[in-house]
């Protein structure tokens, strides 16, 4: 017990003392031909501590891809790792030979070039490995990115859509770091939150309507999203794209892999600080991230040691400027 408690303190203490960091906004790629290089990298999530990572066209995570509906796109995916992986286009309606599942291995040093027509409506999708038995490890180490599809209907709507100004991707993930600051997998002690690969992030937002594209990129944690001032926000899209009418809510639950687009109105809040939170205390038992998953703690090692489970916690700080 003492050993486990010491390990937990070691995991949490860097997070407690870690200073706030500006939210990283992934780079973008657009057009009809995309070159994606899967590679190793190194990131200092904690000052002076190098953490080995995986990334696409960078050290961690992947660029945001912009597709236009009905375009035919070619994606040249090169695997620079020393072991096989795959890339799956999560949520896209594409032929099975281009899906990127476990049956479509990209061997080390090789390039896979799927080519398909973009059939989905405007919305937020994502891409990540889907190898047999390796999906969790590869995603946890950093292989994940957003896909934004645009179409003629969405472009006519009065919505924020200036990327990185009033339209932000938020890849929300929980992670475990061991005492050597290395990313650990296959554990339920995921007590460190990241948004776009940033620990303890803040974002300066304009005093207006702002669009957020939420992706629950965690392995098995469900979030009950809400704002710290408990104000209403508006859901405008789900996994499948835009919904018919904005849905006014003050809570939004997303399971792993799910996406949603929301609009938050920061008008009249100049100078204020508001947090995007998860109200996990409100999750029903049986849901991953709740107090009790009702599966027997023996089947989920360390689940009941995780301080986030069943707790309300901050995810991202908004500073209205």
Language-model-detected regions and their locations in the chain:
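N-terminal, post-signal-peptide metal-ligating segments of extracellular/periplasmic oxidoreductases
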Residues: 19-97, 101-113, 165, 181-212, ...
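Hydrophobic or amphipathic alpha-helical targeting/insertion segments
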Residues: 114-158
